[in-house]
């Protein structure tokens, strides 16, 4: 099909210009129709001629582009027909077929004629043209070095050996058989030769390529080459670049002459061709040059035919990421209009490499769409400013010229050279002003300047006013574009952050992150253990800092607001209950007890008792006997409020009995006193082992001490049995952790408090230290508690708090089954009518998990740190803490950056963080969309606000996860275990016990150790992997065969007679005499220290022994000090004399040796 389509256009091509190859120019040109006739020409003819020109100059694109430029100038009437003919003849000089083909398109009366072949002089060959031809050959055969080297070898053999020009042509014809254009161009460098090769020569017929009918280049017509080569030597190498007037100069001659001038050939030979055989005659002896490539100007010009953008500048010198130095052999073009100042300041060797969005090798941030808008505005502004400036400059020049004409400084009669008065920029401005008629106006200006200048000046001023108004109008548009896109243009990370954030917030991503960190840390520990011999470190895998405690309040308000707006009441209750009873106490946040009702009571007391201290009113009420019978330190009801940490449905007021109104009122008064003293005593919290204790704890602890009675049951140390054999002294309450049990006193004890005020609630020693105490007493209590009074913080829990009174196993099992079957009517109410907090309800179903732990533990295993809280959890609870940390980190980032921007000198906003929180609330309740929220964040915080764009998704995911944790059975058990472990005394809390209990719950699941330090406000999370926390399996039974080997062979006793000698006899004789071997043994072991700590494992199946790492035996003896001798004794005098004599001999030998060396010196 392709062949058919080609034949369709044969007829138009035959009517159009017929173009032959460059090789035909040396022979008889083909018949070309033309000579000034334009009849029958079509667009196909013009395209065919253009294609022929393009194919002819496929290695020289500049000529083709120059030809197109000539045609464009002719179309624009910049040049006439004669000018076109002159430029085309000069451009296509030597290409007769193209010149004759161009006649077809000339009008009548115009024709390009050629000189007869005999009279036409030989085209001079330029050295630069020869170099370009060699480079084209090298570029054409870039993938085949063999062909290029073969071509160089042919030239070298022609220069050095007996090879005629005929043979050179035949070999080059074989080499360029598929590249007729190169072969035709090679002929131009050869001298005229005749009679050497016949057309009927078999070699020539075999190598001649038949021409395709549509091929632009016909087959080459060989000629006979037989002529003496004339060479002329020049003193300077630069003269070789000039055009040669001698037609016999060729490529081979230039190559040889160039090498000769550079001193590569010591004796330059004269080459003569006699009867077809070249004879080399050397003036001073000639040696074969080993490497023709030593001439850099000829063969090493790798960059001659390459543009700068095609150069590989990777290995070149680098100044900045954008600038590279050109290679030393790259030709530098000589500027036309450079003066001395330009020579000093302008750069010719450093070029700017491609960078930015087009080149990804240079890591440069790509422009976003908002930056593109700003850049377009800048381009428009620049263009308009340039237009206005060019018009203003042209107006000044035209006015100046008109003034000279009007003043007769310049005569109108004489022709005016416009270019002497107007610059090229001014003329280009005038030409652009008139558009398509610009050239006509320029011609008229040159011919009649005094007439055209006033009209042009008026037009310039009109255009100046028009463009000035346009710029004023566009400035409003540009200002809107800048205001709309400025902040967005600075944000390059939000797009990628949004894509990655969903993966980072997933449970799978968070777990994979800490696993990867833990594995890397384990490998580093192993390498460190091998290199240094240290034991693996048990430091957290990840750590997070909570520097701003006020952010916890913002988080609470945020979660509470979201739950009220989105979640149902039941879900909201569970989420907020978990928040205020577990998460906040874990981070050391004080208990939130302020409510709306309490604030109302404060207002009433302030109105009725202006002159009485609120603490005295509370004291009188608490000391009233009528109030003692109803003494129940209950938690006041919580109402929904943004300032209140509890929400409706999550308070414990709904679990209270109906007849507890007086107790509620009593607690209100307690809270009133705490609130009224809040300003005068801002620090109401004192640090204990795991948290901060409120000041009213001692009151409740003493009340509970009364309720304990004699319910103490002894148990083994370390045994975990909270329901049956729990030693009550091992547990205490910490209010900050939400672990405050509220106990109802037995009736007999309440009556005792009424009759015996010294031991009751209002007694002198056992008085309840409530928040209603006077300010001075309150300060003293705070001071005592801060000094570490341990008794002020203990609250001993009765046996009923752990599931009832101490009973037998049957009763315990019965009670347990009854609770499991029927449940409890009120989850907050105990069996004896007492009420429990959230943590106490966790403690009720707790049972012993690990059977037994060692009774004696090392001190390091006991958590004695008073400022940290430890929690063991699973994947779900780890993700909960990570989501909390991410939310905290982003809110803190917003607070920091907003405050930083507010403190900036150019800032006008004084409450940026509040504005941000309002925008976030609007986003959560749906009154604002994400786009508006992002714009407000960028305006408030700046470019760092990209991390806040997904806050709504993070809050939503966090609340869902909180609800999932509250509803999950395994997570609930872990929370119960945490509450149970936190009831221990400081000296009775063991990390290893807690860990084993958690492992008993989770089995093969991942266990995370989460620890928060209040002193450092640091949260550390460690994945307890199998290599650092898996307890070793203890063997229960031993196989009989292995037991026999272990007892009879490995641990067998060897008698003294069978033992080999451990000491040499001569050494034993020094320490003991005959019959005193035991005495000698004891003397030998004096001062010797032996430490046996090597451990090993023995495989029962193979009896192989494996020594444990980091264990070893050590034997060493301390160096004994020399005994001080008596200086006056005879033995000491004798010893000192001998030592002095020995010292003098050594000195004498040293001087003798030194003298000998000095004498031997020259």
From Swiss-Prot:
The keyword Transcription regulation applies. It is found in: Nucleus. GO terms for cellular component: nucleus. It comes from the Eukaryota. The modification Phosphoserine is found at residue 817. SMART domains: HDAC_interact. GO terms for molecular function: transcription corepressor activity. Residues 18-30, 1123-1139 have a biased composition (Polar residues). Residues 1-37, 702-727, 743-779, 803-830, 1121-1143 are annotated as: Disordered. Pfam families: PAH, Sin3_corepress, Sin3a_C. Keywords: Nucleus, Phosphoprotein, Repeat, Repressor, Transcription, Transcription regulation. Residues 28-109, 123-193 form the PAH domain. The keyword Iron does not apply. Acts as a transcriptional repressor. Plays roles in regulating gene expression and genome stability. This is Paired amphipathic helix protein Sin3-like 5. It comes from Arabidopsis thaliana (Mouse-ear cress). The gene is SNL5.
């Amino acid at each position: 099909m392709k062949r058919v389509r080609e034949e369709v256009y044969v007829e138009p091509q035959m009517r159009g210009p017929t173009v032959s190859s460059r090789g035909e120019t040396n022979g008889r040109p083909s018949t070309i129709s033309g000579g000034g006739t334009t009849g029958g020409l079509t667009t196909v003819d013009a395209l065919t001629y253009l294609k022929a020109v393009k194919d002819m100059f496929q290695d020289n694109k500049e000529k083709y582009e120059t030809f197109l430029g000539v045609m464009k100038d002719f179309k624009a009437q910049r040049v006439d027909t004669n000018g076109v003919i002159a430029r085309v003849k000069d451009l296509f000089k030597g290409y007769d077929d193209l010149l004759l083909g161009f006649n077809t398109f000339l009008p009548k009366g115009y024709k390009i004629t050629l000189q007869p072949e005999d009279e036409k002089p030989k085209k001079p060959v330029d050295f630069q043209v020869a170099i370009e031809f060699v480079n084209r050959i090298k570029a054409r055969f870039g993938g085949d070095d063999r062909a290029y080297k073969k071509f160089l070898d042919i030239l070298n053999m022609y220069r050095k050996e007996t090879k005629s020009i005929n043979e050179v042509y035949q070999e080059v014809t074989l080499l360029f058989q598929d590249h007729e254009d190169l072969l035709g161009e090679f002929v131009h460098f050869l001298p005229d030769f005749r009679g050497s090769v016949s057309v009927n020569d078999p070699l020539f017929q075999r190598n001649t390529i038949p021409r395709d009918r549509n091929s632009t280049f016909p087959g080459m017509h060989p000629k006979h080459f037989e002529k003496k080569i004339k060479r002329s030597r020049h003193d300077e190498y630069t003269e070789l670049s000039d055009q040669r007037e001698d037609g016999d100069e060729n490529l081979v001659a230039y190559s040889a002459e160039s090498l000769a001038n550079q001193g590569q050939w010591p004796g330059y030979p004269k080459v003569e061709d006699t009867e077809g055989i070249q004879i080399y005659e050397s003036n001073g002896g000639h040696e074969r040059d080993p490497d023709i490539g030593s001439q850099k100007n000829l063969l090493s010009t790798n960059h001659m035919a390459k543009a700068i953008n095609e150069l590989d500048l990777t290995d070149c010198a680098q100044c900045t990421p954008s600038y590279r130095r050109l290679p030393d052999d790259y030709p530098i073009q000589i500027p036309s209009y450079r003066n001395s100042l330009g020579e000093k300041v302008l750069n010719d060797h450093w070029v700017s490499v491609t960078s930015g969005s087009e080149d990804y090798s240079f890591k440069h941030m790509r422009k976003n769409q908002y930056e593109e808008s700003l850049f377009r505005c800048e381009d428009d502004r620049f263009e308009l400013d340039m237009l206005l400036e060019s018009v203003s400059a042209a107006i000044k020049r035209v006015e100046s010229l008109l003034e000279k004409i009007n003043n007769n400084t310049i005569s109108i009669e004489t022709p005016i050279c416009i270019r002497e008065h107007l610059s090229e920029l001014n003329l280009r401005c005038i030409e652009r002003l008139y558009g398509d008629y610009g050239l006509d106006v320029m011609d008229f200006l040159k011919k009649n300047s005094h007439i055209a200048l006033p009209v042009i000046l008026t037009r310039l001023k009109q255009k100046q006013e028009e463009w000035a108004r346009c710029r004023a109008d566009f400035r409003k548009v540009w200002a809107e574009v800048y205001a709309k896109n400025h902040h967005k243009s600075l944000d390059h990370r939000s797009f990628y952050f949004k894509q990655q954030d969903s993966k980072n917030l997933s449970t799978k991503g968070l777990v994979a992150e800490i696993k990867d960190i833990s594995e890397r840390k384990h490998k580093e520990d192993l390498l460190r253990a091998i290199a240094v011999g240290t034991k693996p470190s048990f430091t957290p895998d990840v750590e997070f800092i909570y520097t701003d405690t006020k952010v916890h309040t913002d988080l609470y308000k945020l979660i509470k607001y979201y739950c009220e707006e989105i979640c149902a009441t039941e879900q909201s209750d569970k989420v907020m209950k978990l928040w205020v009873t577990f998460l906040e106490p874990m981070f050391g946040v004080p208990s939130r007890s302020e409510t709306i009702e309490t604030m109302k009571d404060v207002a009433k007391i302030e109105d009725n008792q202006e002159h009485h201290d609120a603490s005295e009113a509370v004291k009188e009420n608490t000391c009233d006997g009528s109030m003692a019978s109803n003494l129940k330190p209950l938690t006041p009801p919580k109402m929904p409020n943004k300032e209140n940490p509890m929400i409706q449905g999550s308070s414990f007021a709904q679990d209270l009995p109906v007849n507890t109104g007086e107790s509620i009122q009593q607690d209100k008064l307690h809270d009133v006193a705490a609130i009224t003293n809040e300003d005068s005593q801002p620090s109401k919290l004192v640090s204990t082992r795991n948290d901060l204790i409120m000041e009213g704890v001692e009151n409740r602890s003493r009340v509970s001490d009364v309720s304990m009675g004699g319910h103490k049951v002894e148990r083994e140390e370390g045994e975990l049995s909270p329901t049956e054999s729990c030693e009550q002294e091992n547990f205490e309450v910490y209010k900050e952790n939400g672990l405050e049990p509220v106990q109802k006193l037995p009736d007999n004890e309440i009556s005792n408090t009424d009759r015996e005020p010294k031991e009751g609630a209002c007694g002198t020693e056992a008085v309840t230290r409530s928040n209603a105490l006077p300010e001075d007493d309150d300060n003293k209590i705070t001071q005592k508690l801060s000094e570490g009074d341990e008794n002020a913080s203990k609250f001993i829990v009765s046996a009923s708090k752990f599931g009832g009174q101490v009973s037998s196993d049957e009763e315990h099992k019965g009670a347990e089954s009854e609770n499991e079957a029927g449940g409890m009517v009120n989850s907050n109410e105990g069996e004896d009518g007492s009420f429990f907090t959230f943590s106490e309800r966790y403690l009720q179903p707790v049972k012993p998990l690990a059977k037994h732990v060692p009774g004696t533990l090392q001190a390091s295993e006991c958590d004695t740190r008073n400022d940290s809280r430890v929690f063991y959890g699973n994947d779900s609870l780890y993700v909960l803490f990570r989501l909390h940390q991410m939310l905290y980190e982003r809110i803190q980032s917003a607070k920091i950056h907003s405050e930083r921007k507010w403190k900036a000198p150019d800032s006008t906003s004084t409450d940026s963080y509040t504005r941000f929180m309002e925008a976030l609330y609007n986003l959560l309740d749906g009154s604002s969309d994400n786009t508006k929220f992002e714009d407000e964040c960028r305006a408030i915080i700046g470019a760092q606000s990209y991390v806040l764009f997904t806050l709504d998704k993070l809050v939503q995911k966090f609340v869902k996860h909180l609800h999932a944790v509250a509803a999950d059975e395994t997570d609930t058990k872990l929370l119960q275990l945490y509450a149970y472990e936190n009831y221990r005394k400081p000296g009775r809390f063991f990390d290893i016990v807690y860990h084993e209990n958690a492992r008993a719950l989770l089995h093969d699941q991942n266990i995370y150790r989460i620890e928060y330090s209040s002193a450092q406000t640091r949260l550390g999370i460690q994945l307890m992997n199998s290599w650092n926390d898996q307890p070793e399996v203890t063997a229960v039974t031993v196989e009989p065969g292995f037991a026999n080997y272990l007892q009879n062979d490995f641990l067998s006793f060897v008698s003294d007679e069978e033992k080999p000698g451990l000491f040499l006899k001569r050494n034993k004789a020094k320490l003991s005499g005959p019959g005193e071997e035991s005495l000698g043994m004891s003397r030998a072991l004096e001062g010797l220290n032996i430490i046996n700590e090597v451990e090993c494992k023995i495989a029962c199946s193979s009896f192989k022994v494996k020594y444990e790492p980091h264990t070893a035996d050590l034997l060493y003896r301390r160096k004994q000090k020399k005994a001080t001798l008596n200086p006056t004794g005879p033995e000491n005098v004798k010893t000192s004399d001998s030592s002095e004599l020995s010292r003098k001999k050594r000195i004498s030998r040293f001087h003798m040796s030194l003298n000998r060396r000095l004498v031997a010196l020259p």
